[in-house]
């Protein structure tokens, strides 16, 4: 045995003892039975009560309830509090069907239906907020708050019946913010959202420079604001939450009798700061309608929210526990509705077909000509020649194969219109978004056109107005229609049999230019006179809807922007790429702002144009 300093003898330790002392099991896995214990379990998910108030909400409920089902919070830790009253539709039946189906999945369900009466005595219509309606809603919210407190819920989340919570993590994300009152910023088709950045001394909305940067997410985070509404979370664990109330109004309250303002005042008096978070896309809500609006307006407004969701997100999934209403598609009074789509653009095709389905529009899917797949021999076999002297106005390049394919796609539809003798047809491309009340507004316009006996060949439904120096001429006695000046884009248009014959009669394949340059030539509004000399007569009777009913889904520079026409190759030389303009394309930039003098202010307006309230 080796010697050690000081003459001490080295001790020999058995290996099993070293293992026990230095590296053996310990703690929860103690060596002796009495030393073992189980690790601590994680905390349970907080208890949340979700409060839903619904009135005449039948069109929205399948989607709204489906979104609530997909919230990633344990259902056994979630209670439902649902109230409905003053209905003229089947809101009560839908909610009852849903609650019966899900009551075994959630911690508890409280159901407060009232079948009668169907209206308030002081209301002017179903969308009018009278004092008695405000008071009733405040009492219901207070009842939900009391139920949450009585069951010792940690949180209560209020959700309006037409708010779509598309982000399933919304609830957990709001809880993580650790705020007494916090709302997820909801998106809409306009600047409207579920928060205010400013409030006057009388409690009314006040415009502030802070609002738009938050609404557009130029600034991201959670922001202190004087008002949140529609969908928001209250942390009932916070001591200050005990002083919050929806009803009755605070004794010092003298502002307008409005449920959201009353609650904002309650928060102010309790020294509870409201917050809105815009870190992610949480969901969507409709822009409020005017008091005179109908339930049909409301149903179509919510359907438009679903269309807007689909522009950049998957379609809204409906509840799996209730039967979805059936839809009956039609052609809107047209002989045919065409929808052009490249076979390789499956995502666009599926989105457009779903959007048309939601609006109950029947269409014939037309496979677009893929110019990029055409070789020189195929082009020559069709007798295609480029218009002498044509150059793209922004880049000086010739026609691209993508533009060639786009032209042929429309050209083939014009041929079909003539061959089938279709008197009036509607043509859609696949990269567009619909304005609110699209179907009803276009059908109303076409009735006006027919009533007045207007001689027309083509009507733009979506376009980019290029002549911005002076207004276009309004059409007398026809609402929402102007005589079209120089325009870009063929997003959507109505074409007559006579118009299709005129376009084919111009023999455009032998002197081709982009289709949205060809059309202005044919109605004699193209600014380049040299192009017009190759076509005669130029007597296409072209008009445009005003305001427009169709816009692009994406503009140059937007996330997800893809062009199959500009990012291609030159039509007769596959070696010359045109992909340089993907980020700088002027053609697909958003319509520039028009001066007051250039706006089409003389056009007759439809009542549907003003159905929605001011966006803020």
Predicted regions and their residues:
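Acidic donor-binding/catalytic loop of UDP-sugar-dependent glycosyltransferases
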Residues: 62, 90, 138, 142, ...
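A conserved hydrophobic helix/loop-capping motif in glycosyltransferases and polysaccharide synthases
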Residues: 48-57, 64, 71, 83-85, ...
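Short, acidic, metal-binding catalytic loop of nucleotide-sugar glycosyltransferases
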Residues: 42-45, 64-77, 87, 97-103, ...
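Active-site-proximal specificity loops/subdomain of glycosyltransferases
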Residues: 90-154, 361-422
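Conserved short acidic donor-positioning loop in nucleotide-sugar-dependent glycosyltransferases
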Residues: 68, 85-87, 161, 343, ...
